[in-house]
């Protein structure tokens, strides 16, 4: 093991070692200094930890160096894998909030499921048209047909349906979206993708604000764009992603 490998392993063990050994753990997320989230059996749990901004940034730099890469303000995102197999996504300012570093670690499953296990669990039911309509869908259809649109919208947000808010400039699209946030269950993990910090969370705690320069989507070669932030989300395991603007290729991601 080289010196840089030893440094990375020491950081991993010091900051995350105890949590990585938790039974059933699938994810670790650090959104800001002093707090860490674990995901076990599909549920997020918050932990207070003595983890500073400098600690998180040093881990990010060490991870980048280990892979012959770099992470800094002009290249603020890195997707990488630890030697022990955990996949990481790290994001530093200005692509996230000032004085924060977003660190997400995904622990690979060691369980091998046989094909029959998938069959018994109904994995192919959607293909064979044997899958029953979800109760949520039936409820939403009933609300829509009854023209109870206010409750229909609230439930769409609660159940995680994809919503697009369209309107002319100054029509209140972002304000309307911010109102709907209150119907997202508070235990879920949320990421936002914004060109300006507009979204404020009052009840939710497990969230990460991601930012891109407003002109970035128009510049060829831009490192931080709505589309790149959306791709970084693939390793951040959010339950909800909020985009304040959809103006380009990110619509297809």
Question: Where is each model-derived feature located?
Answer:
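Structured core elements
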Residues: 27-29, 37, 79-81, 87-91, ...
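N-terminal accessory targeting/assembly segments
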Residues: 1-84
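Conserved glycine(s) of the Walker
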Residues: 172
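Conserved nucleotide-binding/hydrolysis micro-motifs of P-loop NTPases
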Residues: 34, 44, 94-98, 109-111, ...
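Switch/coupling sub-region of P-loop NTPases
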Residues: 142, 150, 155, 161-169, ...
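P-loop NTP-binding catalytic core
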Residues: 44-50, 61, 65-158
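Generic domain-boundary/flexible-linker signal
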Residues: 39, 114-116, 201, 252
